[in-house]
Amino acid sequence: YFSMPKLVPSGSLLGMDTNRIKEWSNVVTAFTEGKVNGKTIGDQGTAPKKVLYLKGPNSTEFSKEPTRYATLIPTVYNADTLGIRPDLIKRPINTWAELLNPEFKGKACILNIPSIGIMDAAMVVEALGEYTYPDKGNMTKEEIDLTMKIFTEAKKSGQFRAFWRDFNESVNLMASGEVVRQSMWAPAITAVRSQGIPCVY
């Protein structure tokens, strides 16, 4: 979805006629309406509902209301979370701020995919009470600089064991116990659990 604001205005994308997509009515409402179980969810950044519909089949403009012309069919989606090893931490963890807690120095890890990792880092910054972003998905240069300053200082102090680059690496770091909490995708937590190792979010 993050590429849609560049692709659509360029005229490089034709709208898909949702009337021709048999299962369109079954697309999760988080994408089509920005709601889950009837409750509106956050729309910071390039929220799918902002870039899902076009005004017409050849439009270079998004529609704020649902139309029959869509930019994408959502196929894979995920949730970033803070994964923890409760057997090694031995106390509740309920805030992203714990990622930078010196109590676990050298046992933390964060995603090393900048477009996603910066969002996880911003959630930590907010949880620490350092700053509240008006829109984490559309940061100013100053907001990026602040976020990176906080994480660069944490890195220099030895807070992080690693910066994971792919799904398997995040699973292996957590399963081995090399890290006890990290930014993590929900399916990776399931993969750790499937090895009989406690892992929660």
Question: What function would you assign to each model-found segment?
Answer:
Residues 158-201:
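Extracytoplasmic/periplasmic substrate-binding proteins
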Residues 2-169:
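Extracytoplasmic ligand-binding site segments that recognize negatively charged/polar headgroups
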